[in-house]
Regions:
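Glycine-rich phosphate/pyrophosphate-binding beta-alpha loops
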Residues: 124-132
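Aromatic/hydrophobic pocket-lining residues that form π-stacking "cages" and hydrophobic walls in ligand
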Residues: 5, 31, 239
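Rossmann-fold NAD(P)-binding glycine/threonine-rich loop
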Residues: 1-15
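C-terminal glycine/acidic-rich active-site capping loop/insertion
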Residues: 21, 115, 138-228
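Terminal low-complexity tails and localization/encapsulation signals of metabolic enzymes
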Residues: 213, 248-253
């Protein structure tokens, strides 16, 4: 269905913007830009587990009437992976578990995806009152030239709740590491910290999506790669769910 919509937009000469909020988030755009400079292949590790209770658990149960977390949540981070690699996904393996009787589907899942440039990605998503908040927000990319990570508050600092919607895209800081070493096998560069404390809130990011659509129309921006990444990310998470359901690795044509 997504591919059909993209094809229709191309045929009609219309602008189609994929509604993934991370695409217009300044800090995430910088995260992607830094990852693209790490060389190939890339190793991409991203998760978002949400320990939900009260209203958030009601929202999650409602969502799981039609989608699993690895599809609903995972598609955003897999889309980031597609932008980082610029490569074609070729193989997906998914695994999941049903940790509650309150839903008919698995409320936990993770996937592994391979790209045709040798890059690999891992994504994990789980929802519910049983989920751990240990390492619930991992956003980490490694390449031959180093690594870049999104760093969130650690123990002893300001606590970030896993079911806080605003925290799902919040970066706090980027940690950039260079792998360059000298003749004594010592690192040449110190790690670089990029503070992202002034990033826009959730509503401001939604506003940026609308602004980008208007810009795409007014400036006739070529959205070919933008749309293809959106289709590829959806293909990956749907393939992951198929893999979970069948127990088989899914190869993408």
């Amino acid at each position: 269905d997504a591919q059909e919509i993209v094809d229709m937009a191309k045929a009609a000469g219309k602008k189609l913007v994929i509604g993934y909020i991370l695409r217009v988030h300044p800090a995430w755009m910088e995260f992607i830009r830094r990852a693209q400079g790490l060389g190939k292949p890339l190793v991409m590790r991203m998760n978002l587990n949400q320990q939900s209770s009260g209203d958030p658990w009601i929202w999650h149960r409602n969502l799981m009437q039609s989608l699993t977390p690895i599809v609903d949540c995972g598609v955003h981070y897999v889309d980031v992976m597609c932008q980082m690699t610029g490569a074609k996904p070729v193989k997906v393996h998914g695994m999941g578990a049903k940790l509650t009787d309150a839903t008919k589907v698995q409320n936990y899942g993770h996937l592994h995806v391979e790209f045709d440039d040798g890059s690999v990605g891992w994504n994990e998503a789980g929802w519910g009152p049983m989920m751990s908040e240990t390492a619930f927000f991992v956003k980490d990319v490694v390449g031959p030239k180093g690594s870049v990570s999104i760093v969130v508050p650690q123990d002893g600092e300001t606590h970030t709740s896993s079911d806080d919607i605003d925290s799902h895209t919040k970066t706090n800081a980027l940690l950039c590491h260079s792998s360059e070493i000298d003749e004594n096998n010592q690192f040449v560069h110190e790690d670089e910290w990029i503070n992202m404390a002034d990033e826009p809130d959730h509503q401001a990011r939604c506003d940026r999506e609308q602004e980008y659509l208007l810009k795409a129309i007014n400036e006739d921006i070529d959205l070919t790669e933008h749309m293809q990444n959106g289709v590829d990310s959806l293909r990956i998470v749907i393939a992951a769910q198929e893999s979970i359901d069948t127990g088989e690795i899914v190869r993408l044509d």
